[in-house]
């Protein structure tokens, strides 16, 4: 019983000591390409978003970084993004492993397949630029995704 209590306390202290997530704009001076979408981002039920105009990464830094980082690309059929269950909800697990975790909120292609890819490329550049500050190794940045985000991750890796 004491062992279970100790492990639970250790796990909770790791979660609580991780830093608060930070959302960083990918293109503060405007994106280099367009998908011709206008208007405001649509926040849908279940933590989904559509019509992303200003792409970002949300970075979750662990209390004790091991140097590795994962960029997560949520899915949504290239029409919307399942930001919570295919993104933010996994952050605490990665952080308990010492892995810095970043969730990409990317723009939809809307006929221009380069738009989401350029957002993913910029996210990797930004992660590597902050390597020293975040305690990560710029050569240990991985990417993963779910559904359309998996396609984007695979495209980024080629």
What are these regions (language model features)?
Residues 1-22:
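Bacterial Sec-dependent N-terminal signal peptides
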Residues 19-65, 113, 117:
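N-terminal cap/lid segment of alpha/beta-hydrolase-fold proteins
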Residues 66-68, 97-100, 138-140:
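Loop/turn elements at helix/coil->beta-strand transitions in domains of secreted/extracellular proteins
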Residues 67-76:
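Short beta-strand element of the alpha/beta-hydrolase
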Residues 76, 105-109:
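Short beta-to-alpha linker loops that shape the active-site pocket of alpha/beta-hydrolase fold enzymes
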Residues 77-79, 101, 126:
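Serine-hydrolase catalytic-loop signature spanning alpha/beta hydrolases and amidase-signature enzymes
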Residues 83-102:
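Short amphipathic alpha-helix adjacent to the substrate-entry channel of hydrolases
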Residues 122-158:
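Primarily recognizes the serine-hydrolase "nucleophile elbow" in alpha/beta-hydrolase
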